[in-house]
């Protein structure tokens, strides 16, 4: 955590670490891991809300807990930019981090793979590997998606690659 800003350090240390090393193929152990994931996500969400930093909503979209969908948003120049968020839990989870997808901005930045999967290889994947199995979905959002949004969304907005929903509605009316 050396070289990290104090806010990120503080946030990360308050997200509960997970203990169960289990993936989708591991039956009852996976159910236990999912319980830990939910506890960690709830703690992270509550922490964000209490700090007036609420920026995502996700939930498992299938009973097995292997497909997750939701919304994330980023505020730039006092305008809220909202995006669909989705990801699948890999079979090799937790050894392999989930690939977070923002399909609406697929192809609009070089820091993204096909299908809207955000690039996390350089900074996040080594951190995930070092902290496996203690890191979970909440950690992927905190250390993967949040910094990616902070780095990429302002550039995409300023270059005109993405437009605010109000701007898009106004230009469609004209």
From Swiss-Prot:
Annotated disulfide bonds: none
Segments crossing the lipid bilayer: none
Coiled coil: none
BP-aspect Gene Ontology terms: protein ufmylation
SUPFAM superfamilies for this protein: UBC-like (SSF54495)
Active site feature: 119 (glycyl thioester intermediate)
Family label: Belongs to the ubiquitin-conjugating enzyme family. UFC1 subfamily.
Protein name as catalogued: Ubiquitin-fold modifier-conjugating enzyme 1
């Amino acid at each position: 955590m050396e070289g990290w800003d104090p806010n990120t350090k503080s946030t990360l240390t308050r997200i509960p670490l997970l203990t169960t090393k289990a993936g989708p193929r591991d039956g009852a152990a996976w159910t236990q891991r999912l319980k830990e994931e939910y506890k960690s996500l709830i703690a992270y969400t509550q922490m964000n809300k209490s700090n007036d930093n609420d920026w995502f909503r996700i939930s498992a979209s299938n009973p097995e807990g292997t497909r997750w969908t939701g919304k994330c948003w980023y505020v730039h120049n006092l305008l809220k930019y909202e995006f669909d968020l989705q990801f699948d839990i890999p079979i090799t989870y937790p050894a392999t981090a989930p690939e977070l997808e923002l399909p609406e901005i697929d192809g609009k930045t070089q820091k993204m793979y096909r299908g809207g999967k955000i690039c996390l290889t350089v900074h996040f994947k080594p951190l995930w590997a070092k902290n496996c199995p203690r890191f979970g979905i909440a950690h992927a959002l905190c250390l993967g998606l949040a910094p990616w949004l902070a780095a990429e969304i302002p550039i995409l907005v300023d270059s005109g690659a993405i437009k605010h929903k109000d701007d898009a509605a106004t230009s469609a009316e004209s």
